[in-house]
């Protein structure tokens, strides 16, 4: 049942992506983790990309942006694209990544709430947004 995701799916949506994300919802945050017992943001994205898209990507959010993505306009975001954030005052590097779904929703491993779905238009995510990217390699 997709209602738990609060996203209205159509026949054009990648059901495997949503099924996989649904299985991760609520997994606790663990820095350096990449399993449902504990996962960080890049570990979550890496696992989804491996399972759903059969692609190997970098293990660090800044490196994913640098080595695996081409930058796209936020208005061109499509299901499976990535959204990147700079959430730390201590560094100017990208520190967070999530997977765009649709209707401004994205899935990510939040350090405070674990794997969840958030809205890119929430104040926090607008303030810390860095770029949108499409995985090309």
Where are these regions (language model features)?
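Intrinsically disordered, low-complexity
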Residues: 1-27, 136-137
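Aromatic- and glycine-rich peptidoglycan recognition patches
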Residues: 2-9, 71-72, 89, 93-137
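Catalytic cysteine-centered active-site loop
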Residues: 8, 27-79, 130
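Solvent-exposed polar/charged
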Residues: 23, 50-51, 99
